[in-house]
């Protein structure tokens, strides 16, 4: 499956839907979606990872990038996180910087 990062907005929320594998080759597309989401000025960023099948270290760095790019008062939620992806996020210690809902 090809990687897809799709941004949608509404009601003060920017949602980025991720599908496929998030790695060094695909992280720039996620970075672009984050930049676009920040530009909307949304008070909440939702990252829908329900179709994300794999996350590599570059994907983890992209999550850190997201946390750094948004304003401090912007809530970032990771939703639909699959068990394999959640395991990697937890091993990296990134589960404390985000509101995470597993699938």
What are these regions (language model features)?
Residues 24-97:
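Amphipathic alpha-helical interaction surfaces in cytosolic regulatory modules
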Residues 1-17:
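Short beta-strand/loop segment at the start of cytosolic alpha/beta domains
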